[in-house]
């Protein structure tokens, strides 16, 4: 490993990673095997991510989201995947599905679907 890192996460991004990891280790990982073995929706993960506001971190603050940048959103997805790959689709699909509304939706649609 080099003494001169070409890239390092900012303190803010490190804090996000640690916070997501903590939630996932405690509330997502314990159910991962059961989710996979029974091919079921990761309800426990969805509830934990929503309670911690990690289910859709990219949603702008004016609609009740965290307004996370792309790197923070990827860090959330990565940490959730570390605990349960199936559950990582929750923030990933929220990002993918909400992007058209964020980019082209009317204010009414944004308030309804993002808020």
Model-derived features with residue positions:
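Intrinsic disorder at enzyme termini
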Residues: 1-12
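Glycine-rich flavin
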Residues: 28-115
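A non-catalytic, amphipathic alpha-helix used as a structural packing/dimerization or gating element
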Residues: 12-26
């Amino acid at each position: 490993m080099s003494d001169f890192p070409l890239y390092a996460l900012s303190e803010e991004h490190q804090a996000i990673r640690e916070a997501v990891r903590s939630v996932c280790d405690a509330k997502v990982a314990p159910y991962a095997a059961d989710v996979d073995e029974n091919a079921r929706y990761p309800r426990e993960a969805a509830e934990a991510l929503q309670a911690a506001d990690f289910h859709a971190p990219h949603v702008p603050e004016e609609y009740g989201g965290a307004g996370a940048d792309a790197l923070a959103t990827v860090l959330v997805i990565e940490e959730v995947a570390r605990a349960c790959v199936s559950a990582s689709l929750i923030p990933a699909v929220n990002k993918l599905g909400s992007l058209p509304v964020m980019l082209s939706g009317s204010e009414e649609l944004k308030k309804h679907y993002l808020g």
